[in-house]
Amino acid sequence: GTPAADKNVVVFGSADMNIYGLNASDGRLLWKINTEAPVLGAVTIRNGIAYIGGSDHKFRAIDIKSGTVVWSYDGVEGYIETKPLVYDNLVIFGAWDKNLYALDKKTGKEVWKWHEGKPGRFYSAAAVWPVAANGKVFIADPERALTAIDASTGKTVWRTKESMVRETVGLSEDKRRIYSKTMNDSVVCYSATTDFPEKIWASNVGFGYEHAPSMPVEKEGVVFGSTKNGLMFGLDAHTGKVLWKHKVGNSLISTLVPLSKNKCLFTATGGEIGLLVIDYKTNKHK
């Protein structure tokens, strides 16, 4: 899964059934935690604590300095691949068992568990990286639904299949809008402030059939996105206007890491890793 770094410590899970903490400066091993199955989940670090889920039906909070497991929740029924969300006093994540979980971030105690829609683990909100704002958690699932959930109670606030989105969601920097890719050509934007599904814009990017769980990310008024076929793109966050498109090979591009509206880091399953630089005046990118 996607690693995270804080206080000169890099934390990541591995298919060899371990969770590692490395010195970010020299790569030296600081600690290692053995689990009972491959660890495919991404990592989120807050206040010196790393949150990560595994395939052994456990979700762990780990002190990144010592490698000590602060708490472990063993109520997960499927494996975890998502990047956990830390919001207020909660840590929130989905698993391939139909459920979205909300745990107390300090104790690991289950606060609520959400599931709605068709039965079966293949419809789980497990690949999406949840986001939250204004007391609501937002997810998109394989049932092609975009959902807002009350962060306090775990009850559904609204749920819509209008735009046929799938497994991607991103939050605007001002926390007033959410973004999601549809399964064909387009990115949509909805309000994050309303108690009903209010679409703000839809943009035809022209990427074709799409199902890659790479999240849209806003930086300095630009929504950065990527696809399963090597395409990266930037949209105006307020209007959806396509600002630029850039292709790197034909493999899946992971969730982009924008450093500014002019620069973003990317990795691809084909092995590519790089820095994309965008000049908005000349519309050139390299």
Segments the model singles out, each with a brief description of its role:
Residues 48, 63, 94, 104, ...:
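Polar/charged low-complexity regions in secreted precursors and cytosolic/nuclear IDRs
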Residues 10, 50, 91, 137, ...:
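Hydrophobic beta-strand positions that form the internal "hydrophobic ladder"
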Residues 17, 57, 98, 144, ...:
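Repetitive beta-architecture junctions, highlighting loop-to-beta-strand starts
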Residues 23-26, 63-67, 104-108, 150-153, ...:
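Short loop/turn segments that connect beta-strands within beta-propeller blades
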Residues 1-7, 15-16, 28-46, 55, ...:
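Extracytoplasmic beta-rich repeat domains
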Residues 221, 228-229, 235-238, 247-249, ...:
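Short, loop-centered acidic/histidine patches that primarily coordinate divalent metals
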Residues 20, 60, 101, 147, ...:
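WD40 beta-propeller blade core
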Residues 13, 53, 94, 140, ...:
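Residue-level marker for isolated small/hydroxyl-bearing positions within beta-strands
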